[in-house]
């Protein structure tokens, strides 16, 4: 992939950009083999990759500069701003949004936040696009509610310029720290969730719910999990750290009992909406801590699917799963190092199948799906 920002030395986020996609896949595969060394793997499935550019469905832009000439991108450690509007990871559909937002910021009087001076209001712009219908969600991350009235008054102009903006919010992040969002979300549109669809499964994206940033590869990840579960005798399943329900909604059948657990209420609202659309009445999604939920249960499902954050599921949940001993565990991980550590805490399971998904091209990161079977 060619990137003018990288060539000019202005951005180094894609550290592997000089390697071919095949070289990147080989290096990631070797890393996964190294991490699972000593753990017998029955089947290594071929890695899955997607487009090398224009694949991201989300932009997270630091706003700097002035209200008349805002700049969207990032700040170097010395405070130097870098404009990332031309980043080749973004689809072409993002460019007109960025172009319209620059004069809009002046119209709304949203002074960019100055980190050094601790002054200003607009900290970040968070833009998400649905691959299903091209609809977009835009979040203005503000220091306070001071400019809300002005923002609301200026919105009709922006929506006339960009009718694809279906969900618009103001997120309030008052602290002087590099934190992307605060707890308060104020909706500026009637619509509160963005419609998405993977493999004919309806999914919803809300402002404070996690959603994969590479929809092409994510849809193949969910489809693969569905295929694996479909080959197993599963009537009762847990989907832990379930997010908006992507895995569970793909794997569920009308006859299957499935419980999805995720700590974020916004994500659970999305999952419940999807389950209702699919007419799956035996799916139950709850906003709880996954480890606390699992360790409080007295029943044992046939399969437990886990999709934890980078820290992994941790030893307490590993110990409980080892004791509870479901017949199957599917582990989806964005950090193979912590996944390998967790699997070593499950000595009564063998690895039947492993597949790497190149969710993050041009970086060392990748997603991996692993099927564990009880000995």
Curated annotation (Swiss-Prot):
Enzyme Commission code(s) on record: 2.1.1.189
Keywords: 4Fe-4S, Iron, Iron-sulfur, Metal-binding, Methyltransferase, rRNA processing, S-adenosyl-L-methionine, Transferase
Residues spanning the membrane: none
Annotated residues for binding of S-adenosyl-L-methionine: 212, 241, 262, 307
Molecular function via GO: 4 iron, 4 sulfur cluster binding; iron ion binding; rRNA (uridine-C5-)-methyltransferase activity
PROSITE patterns assigned: SAM_MT_RNA_M5U (PS51687), TRMA_1 (PS01230), TRMA_2 (PS01231)
Domain of life: Bacteria
A GO biological-process term: rRNA base methylation
Active site residues of this protein: 334 (nucleophile)
Reaction(s) catalysed by this chain's protein: uridine(747) in 23S rRNA + S-adenosyl-L-methionine = 5-methyluridine(747) in 23S rRNA + S-adenosyl-L-homocysteine + H(+)
Classification via InterPro entries: 23SrRNA_MeTrfase_RlmC, MeTrfase_TrmA_AS, MeTrfase_TrmA_CS, SAM-dependent_MTases_sf, U5_MeTrfase_fam
Binding annotation for [4Fe-4S] cluster: 3, 11, 14, 87
EC top class, as a word: transferase
One Pfam family it belongs to: tRNA_U5-meth_tr
PANTHER family: RNA M5U METHYLTRANSFERASE (PTHR11061), TRNA (URACIL(54)-C(5))-METHYLTRANSFERASE (PTHR11061:SF30)
Assigned protein family: Belongs to the class I-like SAM-binding methyltransferase superfamily. RNA M5U methyltransferase family. RlmC subfamily.
Chain's role: Catalyzes the formation of 5-methyl-uridine at position 747 (m5U747) in 23S rRNA.
Record's protein name: 23S rRNA (uracil(747)-C(5))-methyltransferase RlmC
Gene transcribed to yield this protein: rlmC
């Amino acid at each position: 992939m060619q990137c003018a920002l990288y060539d000019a030395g202005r951005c180094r986020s894609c550290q592997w950009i000089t390697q071919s996609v095949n070289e990147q896949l080989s290096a990631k595969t070797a890393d996964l083999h190294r991490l699972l060394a000593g753990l017998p793997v029955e089947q290594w499935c071929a890695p899955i990759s997607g487009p090398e550019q224009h694949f991201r469905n989300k932009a997270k832009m630091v706003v700097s500069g002035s209200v008349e000439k805002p700049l969207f991108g990032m700040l170097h450690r010395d405070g130097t701003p870098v404009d990332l509007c031309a980043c080749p990871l973004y689809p072409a559909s993002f460019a007109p949004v960025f172009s319209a937002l620059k004069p809009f910021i002046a119209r709304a009087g949203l002074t960019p936040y100055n980190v050094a001076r601790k002054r200003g209001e607009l900290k970040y712009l968070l833009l998400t696009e649905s691959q299903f219908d091209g609809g977009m969600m835009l979040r203005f991350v503000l220091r306070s509610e001071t400019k809300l009235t002005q923002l609301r008054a200026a919105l009709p102009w922006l929506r006339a310029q960009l009718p694809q903006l279906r969900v618009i919010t103001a997120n309030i992040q008052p602290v002087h720290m590099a934190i992307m969002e605060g707890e308060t979300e104020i909706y500026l549109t009637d619509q509160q969730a963005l419609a998405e669809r993977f493999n004919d499964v309806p999914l919803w994206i809300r402002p404070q719910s996690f959603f994969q940033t590479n929809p092409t590869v994510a849809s193949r990840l969910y489809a693969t999990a569905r295929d694996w579960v479909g080959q197993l005798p599963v009537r009762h399943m847990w989907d832990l750290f379930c997010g908006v329900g992507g895995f569970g909604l793909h794997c569920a059948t009308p006859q299957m009992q499935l419980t999805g657990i995720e700590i974020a209420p916004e994500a659970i609202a999305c999952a419940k909406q999807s389950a209702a659309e699919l007419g799956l009445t035996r799916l139950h999604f709850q906003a709880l801590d996954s480890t606390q939920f699992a360790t409080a249960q007295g029943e044992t499902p046939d399969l437990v699917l886990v999709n934890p954050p980078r820290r992994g599921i941790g030893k307490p949940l590993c110990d409980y799963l080892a004791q509870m001993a479901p017949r199957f565990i599917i582990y989806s991980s964005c950090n193979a190092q912590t996944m390998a550590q967790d699997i070593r805490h499950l000595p009564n399971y063998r690895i039947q199948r492993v597949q790497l998904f190149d969710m993050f091209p041009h970086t060392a990161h990748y997603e991996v799906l692993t099927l564990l079977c009880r000995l």
